[in-house]
């Protein structure tokens, strides 16, 4: 397992390109160095687009605020709608100054990217390319 450190700032990732080998397992250590809540999500572009309405729903229900996550509301809403728990193996949602981890095995040739699907962030380019070496 190789470790890659990712820093999230307000609307960009560092590094902006992640180079992996097919079949490689990566431990991503992600820190949110911005002033806003950000998401680190590994998926195809199509999957990100499909996930964005769920994220908008979290904003509408005041679970996802600009600079924090209302974890109590999140737990309550998750009882009615499991997508509100935001407990996906391919993603982590972080408040400012928080750190999270994801371990991911890259075993397909699917074109993946990392993106933040907090409403408005993907649209302004908060995306990092994943390239196979």
Predicted segment positions?
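Short edge-strand/loop segments of extracellular domains
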Residues: 44-50, 132-133
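Surface-exposed loop/edge segments in extracytoplasmic proteins
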Residues: 50-51, 90
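Generic secondary-structure microfeatures
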Residues: 10, 24, 30-34, 44
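Extracellular/periplasmic metallocenter environments
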Residues: 12, 31, 35-36, 66-71, ...
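Outer-membrane beta-barrel and related beta-rich outer-membrane complex signature
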Residues: 52-56
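N-terminal edge beta-strand
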Residues: 1-26, 83
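Beta-strand signatures of extracellular beta-sandwich domains
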Residues: 39-43
């Amino acid at each position: 397992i190789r470790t890659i450190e990712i820093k999230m700032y307000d609307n960009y990732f560092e590094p902006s390109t992640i180079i992996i080998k097919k079949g490689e397992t990566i431990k991503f250590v992600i820190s949110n160095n911005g002033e806003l809540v950000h998401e680190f999500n590994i998926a195809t572009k199509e999957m990100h687009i499909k996930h964005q309405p769920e994220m908008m729903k979290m904003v509408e229900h005041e679970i996802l605020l600009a600079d924090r996550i209302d974890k109590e509301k999140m737990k309550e809403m998750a009882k009615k709608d499991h997508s509100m728990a935001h407990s996906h193996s391919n993603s982590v949602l972080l408040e400012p100054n928080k750190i999270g981890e994801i371990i991911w095995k890259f075993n397909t040739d699917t074109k993946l990217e990392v993106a933040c699907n907090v409403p408005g962030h993907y649209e302004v380019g908060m995306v990092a390319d994943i390239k196979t070496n």
